Each structure stands twice: as C-alpha cells, then as structure tokens.
From Swiss-Prot:
It is found in: Nucleus. InterPro entries: Krueppel_C2H2-ZF, Znf_C2H2_sf, Znf_C2H2_type. It comes from the Eukaryota. This is Zinc finger protein 219.
C-alpha cells in the first residue's frame, strides 16, 4: 500500500515542473484536508486554478531557483542551502554571495577590519543589512514575476518603481523628499568623515587619511562625525536618482579629483590642544589636576602620613584614618602632647618586617619624663604600649633608681623589650618560677579589672631582684602594687575592659588575656614549658602534655615519686610529682586541705547504713566551721613549698594520674579503673597515702566505687588510725 501511494502522488505532480529532478514535494501534501492534490468531497468544484491560488496565498515565499513556496522566510533560507549556486545575500563591495546573513556579516568585516564600534557604526551596519535583505527580496520577486498573482506578491514588486520626486540613498535605498535631507543622511550615517579641501566623504577615518595623503599631499586631522555638517552642494551637481535605472552602490570621487587637479590649498587646521596637565616623568596627560597629583604618587615612595602610636606610615590620609580606628577604638581619643613631650619625629620609610616595630614606638619609649601635673593619672597610651611610669606608685613610694633601666623617667616592662634583654632570665630558674607563680595569681584578678599591666611579670625580674617568697595572698598583693592596681579600687583605664586584649606587636585582638599571653610568646620567642626528659620546649602547657604522653609515657610511669632531673613548668609542677622533701606517711593522709584533725570525716550513720556520707563541701576548711564552701580541688604551693597542706600527692595505682584531692582520686578510680581496682590484691611499694595501709597479713581495702563502699572506706580509715593510736 505504501508503495502505490508515491506513484499516485507523482502522477499529480506531472502538470507542474518537477522539483529536484523528480523528488517528492512532501510539503505540498501536509497542509491539511483543505489543501490537497486530490479534490475531496468537501470541495467538489476545486480545480487546478483554485488550488494554486490558495497555495500561493498561504505560501508567500517562493524559491527563486526551483519555484518552491514556503510559509516562512526562515524555511526558505534553510531551503536555499540545498542550491549550491544560489546565494541570497550578496556583498555590495566585491560581489561575494552568501547563503546566510551571518556569513555575509562576517564577510563584511573583512572589508572593515578596524571599524570603530560606535553607535553610528552599528547603525550603519544595520542599515546595510536591511539594504541587502531588501535587494534579496526584490530579486526573488523579480525572478518569479509571472508566477505571482496574489496581492501580497504585488506588494513586494511595488517598491521596484521609484517615484519621480524621491531622492534615494545609494547605500541603504532610503527615500528622501529633498536632496538636502539625503545629504544630511549621508553625512551622518554613511559619510561621517568629510574632506575639508574637497567634497570627498568616507565612512572610515582611514580612508579619509589616505585620500588626504594621495590627493592633497598633507595629513590633516579629519572632521569628526559630531561636527557641524557642511552645507549641501547645489542640486544641479547631484544627478537625480529617478533618471538612473540602477543607483550606484558607492560614489566614486575620482572624477572630482581629475576635474580639480590643483585645488587652492587651504590653511591647515591647528591640532587640538593637548591636555593641560602632563606628567613630567612618563609623559602621560590628564584633564584634571587631581588626576595628575594622584598619578605622581606612583613615581615616588612618599609616605607622608605617619601613625603617632605605632609609627607606621601611609601614602594616603584615609589609609591612616582607617588605621587609627585600631587604636582609637581601644584607647579612646588620644590626648594632645604635653609641654614636656618631645617633638614628633620625622616620618621615615617603613620597614616591611613587623619585627622592626617590636619595641612599639621608640619615640615614645625614649621620650622624657612627663610634667609633675601629669603624673597623677597615667595616660592610656602608656598602658597600651606596656610602658609604666617609673616614679608613680599607688602606695606613695618612689621608684627605685637602680631597680631597672628607665628611659627618661619611663621604664618599659620586660615584654616590650627585645628578646636579647631577657636572656639573663635563664640564669635564675628559681626566681623565675616564683615570679611566674605571682604572674598566674595576678592574672586571675587582673582579668576582672581589664588591665593590661597585669599581663606582664614583675619588673624586679628583669633587674635581677628576687621576688618575695611569702604566701599566695601577700604575693598577689605585691604583684598588684607593682603593676599599679589598688586593692580597693581600679585604675583609670581599667573601665575600658578591652585595653589588654590587643597584641601590641601585630594588633590582633583576643577575647581573653590568657590567649593574648600565649600569643605574645610567638613574638618574644619564649618557651616556658620544658620537657624534663629531652630538649623539647613548648609555648603552651597542652603542647608539653601531648609531648609527654606521646614520647615519655613509660618514663613518667616508671619514674615513681622521686623528683625529676629538671623542675617542670609551673602549670604542671604541682600535679606531676611531689616535692623532694615530701615522704608518704600514714599521718599525712588528709581529706581536706588545711584540716586540723588527721582523721577522715566519719559518716553520720552507722557502719551498715546505705546513706551517702556527708558532702565534702560541708567539711571544715582552714579551721573554720559552720560554713558551706565548695570543694577546692586546685593545687597551690604552700608557704613551705609543699603541694597541699600536708604535702600529700595521691598517685593512681594504674596510670600516671596524680592529684592532691582524695575525692578526685576516688572518682578517677571509679570511672577509669573500676574492674582493675577490684581485681587488684597486692599494692605497689609506693602506695599513695590516700587509703590507709592495712596491717600486715590483711588484704588492703578497695577504693570507694559505689555508695555501699563509702562506709567501708570510713571504717578502714578508722581502723587504720585506731591502730596507729594504739
């Protein structure tokens, strides 16, 4: 069935000329039931003429080669690709033909490789494309002149007959009423570049320059397209386009040059004045003075704007303004220099290294002493730079003239000095440990006051004077007096709170003073946490703990209660090993630090009671009774240098853990070593005095693991103490 249908369709195509050498025109038979090759029952009187008229009305775009019609021009453009010799788009300059408009557009760029991308140029290109499209349509209508019978086809053929009173543009085929309008149109769109010596015009500046060199022998600057158009020539010089059968695609100015071989030379136009402001170094010109001023900064390293706080220099004033926010937001408005202050130093070229500004403003450190009227309240700038007045003391005493180095009445704290000024600290390790302890105590109180001076150690450390070895309270009081902190009040800049949280070296901000203290070790190179087994030294206690657990865990477990070969850092001195003079005895087993009695707190209930023992926080502490205080599990060095009240340091039997609180040891055993503690029968030789040693021949009691074990622990302690008394 499918083989018989093409034969029938071919029979219907016999009256019309064959297309594509006998190929089937399937598009003719896909128009619906109304348009068909065979008249249907709905159209009994439809003949060949009616069918052709309906088909021509629906398909207005015929192919100029084969006569095939299409509904849309885009389909016709795709169809024209099948004809290799028929190209619808022709170049007006060289006659090149292209099947697609995009290909012709790319070809037109070869004639104008350096065409300026101006609005007028884009409009000219668009007009040329419209002219090409119009020519293509007229060519198709002209080729199918006899076949067009519809009014739409006649409308396409009407533009071929120009009116006698119209002036056409030779480029875009535009019609104008008068010749002046056409000349104005040519000057704006097609001939923006006019020769001032003759009537030559061009659409490109290069063509006008070439014309000036060849015809007139002088290169003069052409008139821009925005200049005032010249008056149009008289109408008799321009031939009427209505008398011409075909308008010329491009005018030829050669006859004009031959007619005027020797024109009178006009005075050459003066070149436009160059920009007023020119750089004397590179020759670049500018239209405004401030452009040249900003450009001249590139040729010289001018750092005219210096920071009065840290000494950094900037090229622009707004850079300095933004930089000053770092200081003013923390210090408040800077005060004017007093009469005794030294004159400002001249700005110097900045150093790229931040280490060059380690002293933080040598001009301020070397400044003379302030006037006596200004010594009542230390300025906030000195607090920011870690500089303390050498003669101002809260207790009214004067500064020691030989206690340390002073620069003009101001003594810089050791953290503001270079590293080489602190090398003598290693010669006195004992004094350094005591000073660090005082520093840690001052941090706990200085953090609430928000003072930067509590960050630094005692100035007596840098001068070689030993710190007082009194109790904790006396040491912290002395540290506050040295740093300028009153017991009953605060300093003037203590209310600012954020003064001591900025690094004076790099300007970084930190949330707490401890983080700033750890960060300052990066600049100072200080590594206070040293390993007792090797040469490792760290800036943080956590680094040393990790190092000891990773590399020296076996050495720590086998070391026993003996002292290490080298004193550990202050953060772990009281938690890793006891003092050399401390010996584990039964009498030193105390439950609470500072308890007068050597007996552990007995339970309020009987031995068989299952109630919990009394809370450790309600026991006596420091000889004071009737107070409910929380349990203090921290370790502090007593007046005699012992860890805890009696020097008791409780060590775990199964791991290197050590603590001064028996409750914490019991909790540690319950959490980590409950099963191992139950199966343990023989204690080690260095058993901690936390649990009283049982008489010979008896099994030592297990540590308190549950609530039932608490009374047992009390009974064992009572039995041990009773045996000792007997």
């Amino acid at each position: 069935m499918e083989g018989s249908r093409p034969r029938i369709l071919v029979g219907h195509l016999e009256p019309s000329p064959p297309a594509f050498d006998g190929e089937l025109d399937l598009q003719r038979y896909s128009n619906g039931p109304g348009v068909s090759g065979t008249p249907g029952p709905g159209s009994p009187g439809m003949g060949a003429v009616g069918w052709s008229e309906t088909r021509a009305g629906e398909r207005r775009f015929p192919c100029p080669v084969c006569g095939k019609r299409f509904r849309f021009n885009s389909i016709l453009a795709l169809h024209l690709r099948a004809h290799p010799g028929a190209q619808a788009f022709q170049c007006p300059h060289c006659g090149h033909r292209a099947a697609q408009r995009a290909l012709l557009r790319s070809h037109l760029r070869t004639h104008q490789p350096e065409r300026p991308r101006s609005p007028a140029a884009r409009l000219l290109l668009e007009l040329e494309e419209r002219a090409l499209l119009r020519e293509a349509r007229l060519g198709r209508a002209r080729s199918s002149g006899g076949m067009q019978s519809s009014p739409a086809a006649e409308g396409l053929a009407r533009p071929q007959v120009p009116s006698s009173s119209a002036f056409r543009c030779p480029f875009c085929k535009g019609k104008f009423r008068t010749s002046a309008e056409r000349e104005r149109h040519l000057h704006i769109l097609h001939r923006p570049w006019k020769c001032s010596l003759c009537s030559f015009g061009s659409s490109q500046e290069e063509e006008l320059l070439h014309h000036s060199l060849t015809a007139h022998g002088a290169s003069e600057r052409p008139l821009a397209a925005t200049s005032t158009p010249e008056p149009p020539p008289p109408p008799q010089q321009e031939p009427r386009s209505a008398l011409e059968p075909e308008p010329e695609p491009e005018p030829r100015p050669e006859p004009d040059r031959e007619a005027n071989p020797a024109p009178t030379p006009a005075p050459p136009e003066e070149p436009p004045a160059p920009p007023e402001f020119r750089c004397q170094v590179c020759g670049q010109s500018f239209t405004q003075s401030w452009f040249l001023k900003g450009h001249m900064r590139k040729h010289k390293a001018s750092f005219d704007h210096a920071c009065p706080v840290c000494g950094r220099c900037f090229k622009e004033p707004w850079f300095l303004k933004n930089h000053m926010k770092v200081h003013t937001s923390k210090l408040g408005p800077l005060r004017a220099p007093g009469p005794g202050s030294a004159p400002a130093r001249a700005p110097q070229p900045p150093d790229l290294s931040l280490l060059a500004y380690e002293p933080l403003g040598p001009a301020l450190l070397l400044a003379p002493a302030p006037a006596p009227a200004e010594r009542r309240e230390p300025p906030s700038l000195l607090g920011y730079l870690s500089v303390r007045a050498g003669e101002v003391r809260p207790n009214g005493e004067g500064a020691d003239p030989g206690g340390g180095r002073s620069y003009g009445g101001f003594r810089p704290l050791p953290s503001a000095l270079p590293n080489r000024a602190r090398r003598h600290r290693t010669e006195e390790p004992e004094e350094e440990e005591e000073v660090v302890e005082a520093e840690e105590e001052s941090w706990a109180r200085g953090r609430s006051l928000g003072s930067l001076t509590s960050l630094h150690p005692n100035p007596g450390e840098g001068s070689g004077q030993p710190a007082p070895a009194a109790g904790t309270q006396a040491r912290s009081t002395a540290t506050q007096e040295e740093n300028g902190l009153l017991v009953g009040g605060t300093r003037s800049e203590a209310g600012r709170g954020a003064t001591g949280k900025d690094c004076p070296f790099c300007g970084k901000s930190f949330r707490s003073a401890h983080h700033l203290k750890v960060h300052l070790r990066v600049h100072t190179g200080e590594r206070p946490y040293k390993c007792p087994h090797c040469d490792y030294a760290g800036t943080q206690s956590g680094s040393l703990k990790y190092h000891l657990q990773r590399h020296h865990r076996e050495q720590r477990s086998s070391a026993g209660p003996g002292p290490p070969p080298e004193p550990p850092p202050p953060s772990q001195r009281g938690s890793l090993q006891p003092q050399s003079g401390a010996k584990p005895t039964q009498a030193s087993a105390t439950w609470v630090e500072g308890t007068a009695s050597t007996r552990p707190p007995s339970s309020s209930t009987g031995p068989g009671s299952r109630r919990k023992p009394a809370s450790p926080g309600r026991t006596l502490r420091n000889g004071r009774g009737g107070e409910a205080e929380p349990l203090d599990l921290s370790l502090r060095a007593g007046p005699g240098g012992e860890a805890g009240a009696g020097g008791a340091l409780h060590r775990c039997l199964f791991c290197p853990f050590a603590t001064g609180a028996p409750e914490l040891m019991a909790l540690h055993l319950q959490v980590h070593h409950s099963r191992r503690a139950r199966g343990r029968r023989q204690p080690r030789a260095d058993t901690s005095p936390t649990y009283v040693r049982a008489p010979s021949g008896e099994t030592p009691p297990s540590p308190p693991l549950e609530e039932e074990g608490s009374p047992g622990l009390s009974r064992s302690g009572e039995a041990g103490l009773g045996g000792q008394e007997r």
